[in-house]
Regions:
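Terminal connector regions
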Residues: 623-670
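Charged, amphipathic alpha-helical linkers/stalks
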Residues: 651-652, 658-729
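Glycoside hydrolase catalytic-domain context in secreted enzymes
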Residues: 1-624, 642-647, 651, 756, ...
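Long, low-hydrophobicity ectodomains and other hydrophilic envelope-associated domains
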Residues: 694-818
């Protein structure tokens, strides 16, 4: 596909005035685009989210503080990634598209496929994996499903958006090879194989340029290299310089910021800073999308099959849970044995994360209310602990007595709501200590403990010896309770495999010295050694490796055949239960000239086999199997050599190995091993400035904060503001933030404001505040109070006057084209 997109609605664009063109590139409301009535260009509705529709019933707000319509809450992306099942992803996508269409939503903001650089990222539950290949394949399946229902999918957040702390005011410093191989490959697959029709740009800068203003990213890579023919949408409030965004390839600034940005666009065209051809191209792409989404569209069926979608959520959850441990085959449960169920999560499940993706579910199951549907000998159940930290000694004693008298204890525990949320990164990888204290005390009176985990990201598990079995449900959606019991009772054979590594401790992780950034820049010194690529290459022992998961049956691998364009391998179910295996293909190049991980996932297949059944699978090679990005030549190349093809049940459980010769096309190798010794060993936790500079190919940017605050500095940085009032506001915000954290429920509004740059005040207030006023606010914060107040007051009246004038121009459009 050529990168130059022919406008289908060119004649329509030619009829538009410059005021209309500039206005349509910014939102009308929080969730709607702007219509042009005289040309019959309608408004369309956008909505979160990645695992369920979050369309608000009343006035819209970015974080969902107002109630949303009921929708199916499917398991989060982090959960579904563990299924390794692209067909399941597509089926979920179809259901999401159907529900979106029923609510007149034209663009669904998801899936999220940022790379899990660190387990501490507060939004990891929304992302698929630490591996770009698996992330991209699963995202593409969602996208195909969503778009099959006439709704655009909008994968997010392009790109290198791996931390929540000051996400709108942070610069990701990353070398081009790591950018291409790790942080863009998933998006590339989503575009090329999923044919995504929209993309959301991220808040952050990439090497000093905001993602939404990065022409290299949005035009050279996205449109030219990948053939993207859709629209680029900002993250909400993520537009820094709208004119630069339009020039770079961004189509739609969200949410509404009044007409401030439109006036900037018109001024830029008139003074030559923005080519009118670029403006027309962005408008044409957006109008093409709007008309495609609305032309010939029938009235939506306001109903969807709630029960069918609930059952799909149940199936998806069951297929995505990971059995991490099963000593002495304690699972599936013996129905004759007495069972005690302990844990707050058994009564109030944690089935989704917090933030803009939060869904108002059609129904929610909890284990306590559906137990009667299963043939189990339940001795009793109680909380034993409270996830908010409240202590009830009587309940705790009852839990211990109950455990003492039961044959088996099912202990439900995990991360609480404050641990994982948009806008907030974790500070450690531990489960709350009160839960672990109770688990350890129970283990002293009953050795038959089955741990049921709820968490959206990797955790430390020093307590795992207390459990005879561990079933990890992740955040498994509204039907997670029945899915859990289906596995515990043997109705479903677990087939989930970890889509991320579980290290023994946080200090083992490759980026732990660099994450999260507390300065202006976040330095990606670990390069391509993210997740298993690091642990496997540097021989770091982990708790559970990438791709790991147990089953109630056993599988053997045999007869590996390596062909020019792929492999064939036979898999046999040697157990006495039907089950599914995830066959994983890794590729490595021993003694490579260009440093690289020891092995990388390059293909996988999930196969369902009856007891005793054997089947031959084929996993193809593709354009990503042997490639690396050569920073010297600026292109994808293949290094000549004998590649290892490794097939197994996890990155650490390789069953079959073979070799294949490949003739490369490298035109000069990019690195000097003598200057990059640690990158060649994979031991990247303490990369020196000299070695990182060699990797980047240029000086390391100065990431220190300057004395004066600027419009792109975060509001939470007012702790060193010169203005006493600003410091007081900072203390008040911090107090409110800490109060919500102490209560166990994050205040999303406070978190968003806390990490928002000053310019966000103009971008998130619907036109009430202009950028002129923001500059005044910053002047006041920096100690120039009277100057700042003058700009704010004067700017307020000028903004009102100019907005009214712009409205009149739009209403009077259609006469002489300006």
């Amino acid at each position: 596909m050529g990168w130059k997109i022919v406008m289908k609605q060119q004649k329509l664009v030619e009829k538009m005035t410059i005021e209309e063109k500039a206005a349509i590139l910014s939102g009308k409301t929080v969730w709607q685009t702007r219509e042009i009535d005289r040309l019959s260009i309608p408004s369309i509705f956008l909505s979160d989210g990645p695992h369920g529709i979050r369309k608000q019933a009343g006035a819209g707000d970015h974080l969902g503080l107002n109630a949303s319509l009921n929708a199916t809450c499917f398991p989060t992306a982090a959960t579904i990634a563990n299924s390794w099942n692209q067909d399941l992803g597509e089926e979920i996508g179809q259901a999401l598209g159907e529900e979106a269409a029923s609510m007149d939503v034209s663009i669904l903001l998801g899936p999220g496929l940022n790379i899990k650089r660190s387990p501490l990222c507060g939004r990891n539950f929304e992302y698929f994996s630490e591996d770009p290949y698996l992330s991209g394949k699963m995202a593409a399946s969602y996208i195909r499903g969503i778009q099959s229902k006439g709704v655009y999918a909008c994968p997010k957040h392009l790109a290198v958006n791996s931390q929540e702390l000051r996400r709108m005011a942070m610069d990701a410093v990353v070398d081009e090879r790591t950018l291409r191989e790790i942080y863009l490959t998933g998006f590339e697959i989503a575009v090329k194989e999923g044919h995504a029709k929209a993309i959301m740009s991220s808040y952050n800068q990439i090497n000093g340029i905001y993602a939404n203003e990065d022409k290299h990213l949005l035009t050279d890579i996205l449109r030219k290299d990948w053939g993207f023919d859709g629209i680029v949408i900002t993250d909400w409030g993520g537009s820094n310089d709208h004119v630069k965004g339009v020039a770079a390839g961004s189509n739609l600034e969200m949410p509404s910021c009044g007409y401030d940005s439109a006036r900037e666009v018109i001024a830029a065209v008139r003074n030559g800073k923005l080519k009118e051809a670029d403006l027309d191209e962005r408008v044409g792409e957006l109008v093409d999308a709007v008309m495609e989404l609305t032309s010939g569209k029938k009235l939506s069926d306001k109903n969807f099959d709630r029960n069918a979608h609930h059952q799909l959520a149940r199936k998806a959850a069951a297929e995505s849970m990971v059995l991490l441990k099963n000593e002495k085959q304690i699972l599936p449960l013996d129905t004759k044995k007495s069972i005690a169920i302990i844990g707050d999560f058994a009564f109030s499940p944690r089935y989704q994360g917090a933030g803009s993706s939060m869904v108002n579910p059609t129904k929610v199951e909890d284990m306590s209310s559906i137990l009667q549907q299963y043939d189990l000998n339940i001795l009793g159940m109680t909380r034993g602990y409270h996830r908010n930290g409240d202590v009830d000694e009587n309940d705790r004693k009852f839990a211990l007595n109950l455990s003492m008298n039961a044959d088996i204890v099912i202990f439900c525990f995990g991360l609480d709501e404050i641990s994982e949320s948009e806008g907030l990164d974790r500070t450690h990888m531990r489960i709350p200590q009160d839960q672990i204290d109770l688990l350890q005390d129970i283990s002293k009176v009953n050795e038959n403990i089955i741990g049921i985990l709820s968490a959206g990201s990797a955790i430390e598990m020093p307590w795992n010896t207390c459990c005879k079995a561990i079933l990890h449900g992740y955040l498994n959606g509204q039907a997670g309770a029945s899915a859990t019991l289906d596995i515990l009772t043997g109705k479903v054979n677990p087939s989930g495999r970890l889509a991320e590594t579980y290290p023994i401790s946080y200090e083992q992780t490759p980026a732990y010295r660099y994450y999260p950034s507390n300065e202006k820049t976040s330095e990606y010194r670990e390069s391509v050694y993210v997740g298993y690529r690091y642990y496997d290459t540097s021989k770091v022992r982990v708790q559970f490796p990438f791709g790991f998961g147990l089953s109630y049956t056993e599988f053997t691998y045999s007869d590996l055949i390596i062909e020019e364009d792929g492999i064939k391998v036979s898999v046999t179910n040697t157990g006495d239960r039907d089950g599914a295996e995830v066959v994983q293909m890794y590729v490595g190049l021993p003694n490579a000239i260009v440093f690289r991980p020891e092995k990388e996932l390059k293909g996988f297949a999930k196969v369902y086999l009856k007891a005793g059944e054997s089947r031959q699978l084929r996993i193809p090679f593709d354009d990503k199997t042997f490639r690396y990005w050569n920073i010297k030549t600026g292109q994808w190349e293949i290094e000549t050599g004998t590649y290892q093809i490794m097939v197994g049940a996890s990155v650490a459980d390789i069953r079959l190995t073979g070799m294949t010769e490949r003739t490369g096309n490298s035109k000069g190798y990019p690195y000097n091993p003598a200057k990059m010794p640690y990158y060649y060993t994979g031991i990247v936790q303490k990369i020196s400035d000299e070695e990182f500079r060699e990797l980047l190919g240029h000086e390391i940017p100065n990431g220190r904060w300057s004395g004066n605050l600027e419009i792109n500095d975060a509001i939470c940085q007012m702790y060193y503001a010169k203005s006493r009032l600003a410091r007081l506001i900072y203390r008040c915000l911090t107090k409110m933030k800490k109060k919500s954290e102490a209560q166990g429920k994050p205040d999303l509004n406070i978190l968003f404001i806390y990490n928002m740059p000053f310019r966000g005040i103009a971008k998130m207030t619907g036109g009430a505040v202009s950028m002129e006023m923001v500059y005044g606010i910053v002047d006041a914060v920096n100690g120039h109070f009277m100057l700042g107040v003058k700009k704010v007051v004067g700017g307020y009246f000028r903004n009102r006057r100019n907005n009214k004038k712009y409205e009149k121009l739009l209403k009077g459009a259609g006469g002489k084209r300006r």
